[in-house]
Amino acid sequence: MNEKDVVDLLKKVESIGVNVWITGGWGVDAILGRQTRPHSDIDFFVQKKDASAFIEMIKSNGYCRTKVESDDQSVWCAAHDRTIDLHLFEFAEEGTLRFENETYPSDILNGKGTIGEVMVRCLTAEAQVIYHQGYEQKEKDRHDVLLLCNTFGFLIPEEYACERPKQ
């Protein structure tokens, strides 16, 4: 998904009054204020209470649900290789949020960044690094984590510290 597609989509989201948070590769690039690699999709965190409005908006813009990962996560695709990975969450007890039946501190959503000229909410840099752990990483994950760690002075997680052979 290119920057123009993302900016156009963000403007449409803003027009319906739904708050979104960006995560994944575009979330990393938003924090850094520049695009650092190509992206196949954009990951949106949307409150469950806003899910219907958000889904209606993307459907009216040509997106169709192509995959359901769980009740809280689905993939939506449109023409021209535009893909949305939609994550639904809800704010819970004071200072927490619930996603996929897990509880997280809500301050993970305190990140701010830019995509193009658009200011966006996103996961914090530290949260991006934390949630890029514990699964088999792709080269793009390695790129994102190392870039965040080097930019913000975070310790590189052990699973990213060793150079992996190219496959």
Model-derived regions, located:
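Compositionally biased terminal segments of proteins
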Residues: 1-167
